């Protein structure tokens, strides 16, 4: 069964090791007849989560007006979500952390997704 694979690149470097690794993964997924979509976080505007929890009261709709709405749409469509990023100071880089924090708005919709870190 073909899957819809979403690769989210969270490195600030466009052609670093993370991009190379993600590109190799994408090539393998495509060769196995899966549809692949890529999002490069450094090219997106993502506002920090304010922790207001309004998203929990209105069906996962965040009040921030930025590129996360596009990312949410792609996450909803995907069967497999790959989070590709380097490790900086023992954790996610800030680009990836900001995006992950904002997925609080859609956490109930992500339970059945298959994530690869």
Description of each model-found segment:
Residues 20-23, 52-54, 95-100:
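Short, glycine/charged-enriched secondary-structure capping and boundary segments
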Residues 15, 56-62, 69:
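Cys/His-rich zinc-coordinating "finger/knuckle" motifs
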Residues 63-117:
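Helix-loop-strand module that forms the ligand-binding subsite of alpha/beta enzymes
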Residues 2-34:
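N-terminal beta1-alpha1 ligand-phosphate binding loop
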Residues 32, 58, 77-78:
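Structured helix-beta-strand junction loops
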Residues 40-61:
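N-terminal beta-loop-helix "entrance" segment that forms/cooperates
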